[in-house]
């Protein structure tokens, strides 16, 4: 498999309607690592460049990964599956931001080049929840609290007899 280039000339990628796909190790994403429990694993991706009216171009970005997060409730590690399918519009002037479709994310282009790994990493960072929570986690302490509450006699039960 061909390695993902560090930088891509955007105009060539757009006019050639290039497709980059493959996988990359999570360890190569320094900003994302700070949000994860560990940097094990790989990410599958696909970036397909297209022409876009009024913009420098756009890309269909698809990313698939299992990210290792720490549940804020249980403080245990869990795998968070991520499936991303988004459209990124490339701009080099804020005036073009209004030309982006409503469902399109903006990506700033400097000197005509983009870094595809940064685009993938940006998408993953946006997918990580602010407060990671393992939905499959059952909090044992809450279950015990419910059982204790059920076993205690209701102090108002005696009022029932006063009628």
Tell where the protein language model's regions lie, with residue ranges.
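Charge-rich, low-complexity linker and terminal segments
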Residues: 1-17, 92-163
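A positional/architectural concept
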Residues: 1-64, 68
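Hydrophobic residues in beta-strands and at strand termini
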Residues: 24-26, 49, 90, 116, ...
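Short, low-complexity, polar/charged sequence segments that are solvent-exposed and flexible
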Residues: 27, 39-43, 65-67, 79-82, ...
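Residues that cap or initiate secondary-structure elements
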Residues: 28-30, 51-55, 71, 75, ...
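Short amphipathic alpha-helical leader/targeting segments
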Residues: 36, 88-89, 138
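Helix-adjacent hinge/juxtasegments
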Residues: 58, 66-98
